[in-house]
């Protein structure tokens, strides 16, 4: 027999399943009672009633008939589990009024409300039923993480125990209290950002740490997570930056300008902020992230492809609220904003060649260094002012160097070469 699979289920698979329509609909929720009318005039009782067992356990159950009708016997009775008739070799008559059942190596319940174990009369009518709960006790929840949106609330989520599935209805309660005083509180808004999460909407204190933990309970036991201690100011996140605008930078074919505003919900609070930008081309799903935006609210993306549509998003990390030393939590990304770079006016492969201007060398150390600098710049997107100041300084130095070379060669501003004068006389 395969490990972990119950004997009766494995054997009953050889028989065609009994239609669920033959059972009362309350059985689907494992709510059983005495049949009302029908051909089953006798009633019975199953013992034990509604047992709770660990996976791999065995069950010894009995169905005992009682009633006032003469001739009532256990002969012809049979069992079903979740609508499937169990093999007759799993049952035996104890006496004229009692049918016993032996199940071994039970698997986890197929529904958290319990499996349906039913005793039937010869004609198929229901005599008695029991809910069978088979599962595992909960394990200690872990990995609790919490965040506060704009310091107005607190949302937490966690991971259930190592195995996760207990096969039984398991209740998770998030508890919290002020660290040094106050009573335990229970979160009430569950499943807000997933199956294991809870939302505390209001009445939170600032500048005072909270203790937060999760308790898990089911029919087989309980478990409690480690305590998480946090200050709301240390876990603040905010809405994505609004009013993100992306535009061209004049006629520069490889650059786009991105501008946005600070989170309005935090405008009255003392905090720093850092931003991230990510962008992708229109026909790609791969994003490139720019990390060095610092606390600016504008950025120039460089090294882009000419004549290409780009989608851009921005997110914010409002760290350092009221002097908090924590790293902060990133917001969601803003809605994508699109813009295109200008088309290149330079000839492509096979086209004309751009000739150097008169007096400009077509090669040399300076031009090679500039080519290397621009090639490096095209591979990166920079948003810090320092990068563009360096680029502007590079251009100014190049212009000054070019002017110096022209003067050394005797080229006048008008482009005419000056005539060399000899000594007077």
Swiss-Prot record:
Domain Fibronectin type-III residue range list = 140-235, 240-344
Key words, A-Z: Disulfide bond, Glycoprotein, Immunoglobulin domain, Phosphoprotein, Receptor, Repeat, Secreted, Signal
| Chain spans, region Disordered | 335-366, 402-425
Q: Where is the Ig-like C2-type domain?
A: 35-134
Indicate which residues are glycosylated according to the record.
95, 107, 143, 171, 295, 385
- UniProt record similarity statement: Belongs to the type I cytokine receptor family. Type 3 subfamily.
Q: What is this protein called?
A: Cytokine receptor-like factor 1
Lineage, opening ranks: Eukaryota, Metazoa, Chordata, Craniata, Vertebrata
């Amino acid at each position: 027999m395969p490990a972990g699979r119950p004997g009766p289920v494995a054997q009953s698979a050889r028989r065609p399943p009994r239609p669920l329509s033959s059972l009362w609909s309350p059985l689907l929720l494992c709510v059983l009672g005495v049949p009302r009318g029908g051909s089953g005039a006798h009633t019975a009782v199953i013992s034990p009633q509604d047992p709770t067992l660990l996976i791999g356990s065995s069950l010894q159950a009995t169905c005992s008939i009682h009633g006032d009708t003469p001739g009532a016997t256990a002969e012809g009775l049979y069992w079903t589990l979740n609508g499937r008739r169990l093999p007759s070799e799993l049952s035996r008559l104890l006496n004229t009024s009692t049918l016993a059942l032996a199940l071994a190596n039970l698997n986890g319940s197929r529904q958290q409300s319990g499996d349906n174990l039913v005793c039937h009369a010869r004609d198929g009518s229901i005599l008695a039923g029991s809910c069978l709960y088979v599962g595992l006790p909960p394990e200690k929840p872990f990995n609790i993480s919490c965040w506060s949106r704009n310091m107005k609330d607190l949302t937490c989520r966690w991971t259930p125990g190592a195995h996760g599935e207990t096969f039984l209805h398991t209740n998770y309660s998030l508890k919290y209290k002020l660290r040094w005083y106050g009573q335990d509180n229970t979160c009430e808004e569950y499943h807000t950002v997933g199956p294991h999460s809870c939302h505390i909407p209001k009445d939170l204190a600032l500048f005072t740490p909270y203790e937060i933990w999760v308790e898990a309970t089911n029919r087989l036991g309980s478990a409690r997570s480690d305590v998480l201690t946090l200050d709301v100011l240390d876990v603040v996140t905010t809405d994505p930056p609004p009013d993100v605008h992306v535009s061209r930078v004049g006629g520069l074919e490889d650059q786009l300008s991105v501008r946005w505003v600070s989170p309005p919900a935090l405008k009255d609070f003392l905090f720093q902020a850092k931003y991230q930008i990510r962008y992708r081309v229109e026909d790609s799903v791969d994003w490139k992230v720019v990390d060095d935006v610092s606390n600016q609210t504008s950025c120039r993306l460089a090294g882009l492809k000419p004549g290409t549509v780009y989608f851009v998003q921005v997110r914010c990390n409002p760290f350092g609220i009221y002097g908090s030393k924590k790293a902060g939590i990133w917001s969601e990304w803003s809605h994508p904003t699109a813009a295109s770079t200008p088309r290149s006016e330079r000839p492509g492969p096979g086209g004309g060649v751009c000739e150097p201007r008169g007096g400009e060398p077509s090669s040399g150390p300076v031009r090679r260094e500039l080519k290397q600098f621009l090639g490096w710049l095209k591979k990166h997107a920079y948003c810090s002012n320092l990068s563009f100041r360096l680029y502007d300084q590079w251009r100014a130095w190049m212009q000054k160097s070019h002017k110096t070379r022209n003067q050394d060669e005797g080229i006048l501003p008008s482009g005419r070469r000056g005539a060399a004068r000899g000594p007077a006389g």
